[in-house]
Amino acid sequence: MNRQEQIKFIEDNYPAYTNHHSKRRVRHDFFNNIQTELQAYLLGFYVSDGNINEKRKTFRIHLQERDSELVYLYKDVISPDARVFSVAPHEVTGRNGAKVQASGSFGVDICSTILCRDLVNLGFGYSKTYSENHLPKIDKSLIRHFIRGYFDGDGSIMWWYQKADPKWKKNERIRSAVSICSKTNTILLDIQEFLKRHDIKSSICFANRDQMYQMSIPKSQLKKLYNLFYEDSYFYLKRKYKKFNHYVNTEETQLIAEFRNAQGMSASNSNNSPTSVEHPTK
């Protein structure tokens, strides 16, 4: 099913209705039976970057303003009448007590006891961040869409420019990798096993600085991961897709030229002492 066909399928098979608690229409059974790419993707994104409130029985997605497209997707598909909210840019305390400026954010709250119950039954309940989560028991053809959703929430595309090193006869180059993070390693181990079945290599380590586990997929595997994620797929974070597509399908010489232009470097300056500059894109 294409994008519109999936949305029509949801509208026909998961009716939105009100109840005595609220006059807002909600597709309370949206996560009860995962049958489409759309449901699997939104479930994966929720697992990495959403939450449910046990007391209020409220499902929440709260993202940076630049990713508001996903907030509206949750709203339009699950609860067309739900209210969205925004938070203005503000100062927060970052790593080592440093004050940093947080960007504006955007979110949606959906009240539904049934929706929250189904997420708990799927294994992604009220304390999922620190729980030993696993890939959900859904149709195998939908797992890649769940993982893409998880990646859009807690994954990063990283690339490094590395200067030439005449001593070791190494030319300047672009190095890149994809990382996916989690507070526990169980879901990453499941993802790793799934990727292995698709001939995609990865590694998992514990990042002490961030106190979380990190899966890394090296540059040599990114084309295969890109195809697994996006081939015949209709739901994804556009910003990440554009970055991923650019890094995977652009010649390395062009990426090097783009880096030089961005840094105001000439070709001769880029061949000085070896160094690397990291550019993560979450």
Which residue stretches match the model-derived regions?
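Internal intein/HINT superfamily modules and their associated LAGLIDADG
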Residues: 1-282
